[in-house]
Every structure is written in C-alpha cells, then in structure tokens.
A protein has these predicted regions:
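Nucleotide and nucleotide-moiety/phosphate-recognizing core
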Residues: 2-126, 136-151, 157-163, 182, ...
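Conserved TIR/SEFIR loop-to-helix hotspot centered on a Trp-containing motif
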Residues: 129
C-alpha cells in the first residue's frame, strides 16, 4: 500500500513540474558577491529564504536573470533574480512576462524599502515605486503600477545628508542579518504563500508591520 501512495506522490510531483508557469516572483538586488549582503539586496536574500523551503534556487541564466522553478500553493512559479543591476530590473521582468504571456496580476516583486525599520514588512497590491529604482524600472517597462509587492525594511539613512547610494549599498550588520533570517523572512515566505493562494488581503494582514527590529 505504501508503494501505491509513493507512486501517487511521484505522479503528482511530476505533474506539478510539467504545469505551465502561472506566476513570477522577482527578488530585486544587484549581481555579484560584493553586493550579496547589502541593504539593496534584501529582495535576493528574501528569495533565498523562499528557496530554502520550496527549492527552485535561481541558477539558470535566462531573460538577463538567474531563474528557477518551483511549486507554491499549487501554482507553478518562476523565481527570478535579475542580473541587470537594480536600475534596469524591468528589462528582465518584461522579457519573462512576455515569454510566458503573463499579466501584472501574476507578478510578485520583493524589494528593499529605506522608509521602514530593518526587517519590517509592507505588502501592497499596487502603488508607486517610492523611490526604489528597481520597482521604478519594472513600472516603466510594464506601463503599470498594478502588481503586488512585498517591501522589506532596510532602515533609514543615519542622517539627511548621508548619500542614498552609499546607504543602500552598505552591508547589514551580522545582528541585522540574523534578525532578517529569524524574524522577517518567515513572514515573507508566509506572505508569498497567501498571495499565490489568492489571498492578498490576508497576506497584508499577516505581514504588514511585522518583522521589524
């Protein structure tokens, strides 16, 4: 009997793997080891937390991005880390969405947010880029603001005259990295699950304001 159940599970897994891509999740960041732990790479780091649970680590080069595939909440998902550098992220996202013939309603973007304390989350259905260059590039490429996003707080500049580029390209402290892993990214993963299950309002209720130091 156990063999029969194992066979059903194998068939189910293979069927899910063969299903067409129905959603794209994009983690925003900059490519290269020098940027790995920077604030601007919070989207890449959150993506790593997703793949730690679901697999599909983005390793294959396509669409000017590293991509992988997995299944979350019964949906076949393309996971993307654009390799265009932040300001041109929209080029990679638009190419993937065009290839799979998806709409903005099937897109979820995870990015950093300097207006939020480190780790604090904000889920939104749509809206402006709020000064985030990667989000702005995606909005310009798609011609719409109407796509879901999860914003991960990376902290405000230490002072008003502190250079913004220097701030977002500064690295998280070891304590901040540990906090993100333990207290913030689990909420990100749960939010992704709810959004892909069609419960974006539930994701907002579950995640917004959570995860901060």
């Amino acid at each position: 009997m156990a063999d029969i159940f194992d066979l059903f599970r194998k068939i189910s897994k293979e069927s899910a793997s063969a299903a067409p891509i129905s959603h794209i999740i994009v983690g925003l960041g900059n490519p290269g080891i020098r940027y790995q732990w920077t604030r601007h790479n919070a989207g890449f780091l959150a993506m790593d937390a997703i793949t730690a649970k679901y697999g599909g680590n983005p390793e294959r080069a396509k669409f000017n991005a590293l991509v992988g595939e997995t299944t979350i909440a019964g949906k076949r998902v393309l996971l993307m880390k654009p390799q265009t550098f932040m300001n041109h992220s929209g080029d990679a996202v638009e190419a993937a969405m065009s290839f799979y013939k998806l709409t903005p309603a099937q897109l979820l973007v995870i990015s950093d947010d300097i207006s939020l304390d480190v780790g604090k989350l904000r889920v939104r259905k749509s809206g402006s880029a709020g000064g985030q260059k990667g989000l702005n590039s995606i909005i310009e490429s798609l011609g719409t603001q109407d796509f879901a996003r999860i914003r991960v707080g990376v902290g405000q500049k230490p002072s008003p005259d502190y250079d913004l580029a220097d701030w977002v390209l500064s690295v998280f402290s070891p304590e901040q990295r540990e906090h993100l892993q333990k207290n913030s990214f689990p909420y990100v993963v749960a939010g992704v699950e709810k959004i892909l299950a069609g419960d974006l309002d539930g994701a907002m209720q579950h995640c917004n304001g959570k995860g901060g130091i």
